[in-house]
Amino acid sequence: MKSLTLKAPAKVNYRLDVLRRRPDGYHDLRMIMQRIDLCDEITITLSDTSGVRVTCGREGVPDGPENIAWRAANALLALSGLETGIDIAITKNIPVAAGLGGGSSDAATVLLGVNELLGLGLSIERLMEVGVTLGADVPFFVFGKTALAEGIGEVLTAIDAVPPLWLVIVNPNIPVSTAWVYQSLRLTGEWNGDTIPRFFKDVADVCAVLANDLELVTIERYPVIGEIKERLVAAGAAGALMSGSGPTVFGLFASEEEARGAAQSITNSSDWFVVAVRALV
């Protein structure tokens, strides 16, 4: 049967502003979202046996309808009206519940792959519409570019001028619930109205916009996040920030040599998940 293997990249947030709580329980956000080359691997195979099947083998990642990748494939099957089966094998390299968007990226990759395998011809815009019904970050991964994300994350504007930075990703091997972080967030007032530039020429420009309104919530419960930020800066990072709802922290570096040296230094003195990666631009 026809099969396709694709990479599903993680993301970091160079910026995450929580603007206000919405009547529907979600929050209006303003984010700068950047894909990185830490990737899960997704193999999608068409099958004679109807229905969707997901296998992963990673603790904490469900295989059935609770898996967002399963729901992505099922949504496109329902749209297509076809009776074919879809088998999805996920090799997880992105830490789970880490603020890196691994599940959302898997779902977006399944949308793109199933659309291609079944020859549905759905546009990126239509796939993004399907994606937002699955999760707020899914449209960004379908979009496939560095972006300013607004609304709940589904209103996307491409940021084309981004330097090819290197990052060191550090995860303390603690899962954090995104729902808990947002429930614990204490909004102090309306957004102050500052603007975000759309052009970044170097690492200093990116460091100038680093901010995450969720960081104080997560760091209060998991102080190790603050320790990781300090370790990254001490290892030479131009800036460091928690990604998404955490607990993963990233440090920004201007060169591969600096990033790999810092990653090795932190790996040698901790039992954390540490990796040097490129920003995908």
UniProtKB/Swiss-Prot annotation:
GO BP, sorted A to Z: isopentenyl diphosphate biosynthetic process, methylerythritol 4-phosphate pathway; terpenoid biosynthetic process
Q: What is its EC number?
A: 2.7.1.148
Amino-acid positions noted as binding ATP in the UniProt annotation, renumbered to this chain: P95, V96, A97, A98, G99, L100, G101, G102, G103, S104, S105
Known catalytic reactions:
4-CDP-2-C-methyl-D-erythritol + ATP = 4-CDP-2-C-methyl-D-erythritol 2-phosphate + ADP + H(+)
State the Gene Ontology terms under molecular function.
Answer: 4-(cytidine 5'-diphospho)-2-C-methyl-D-erythritol kinase activity; ATP binding
Pathway terms, separated by semicolons: Isoprenoid biosynthesis; isopentenyl diphosphate biosynthesis via DXP pathway; isopentenyl diphosphate from 1-deoxy-D-xylulose 5-phosphate: step 3/6
Enzyme class of the recorded protein, top EC level:
transferase
Annotated active site residues, numbered on this chain, are: K11, D137
Alphabetical UniProt keywords: ATP-binding, Isoprene biosynthesis, Kinase, Nucleotide-binding, Transferase
Keyword Kinase set for record = yes
Q: Which InterPro entries match?
A: GHMP_kinase_C_dom, GHMP_kinase_C_sf, GHMP_kinase_N_dom, IspE, Ribosomal_Su5_D2-typ_SF, Ribsml_uS5_D2-typ_fold_subgr
> Member of which family?
Belongs to the GHMP kinase family. IspE subfamily.
Biological role stated in the UniProt entry: Catalyzes the phosphorylation of the position 2 hydroxy group of 4-diphosphocytidyl-2C-methyl-D-erythritol.
What the entry lists under HAMAP family is as follows: IspE
This one is known as 4-diphosphocytidyl-2-C-methyl-D-erythritol kinase
Tell me the organism.
Answer: Geobacter metallireducens (strain ATCC 53774 / DSM 7210 / GS-15)
Q: Which gene encodes it?
A: ispE
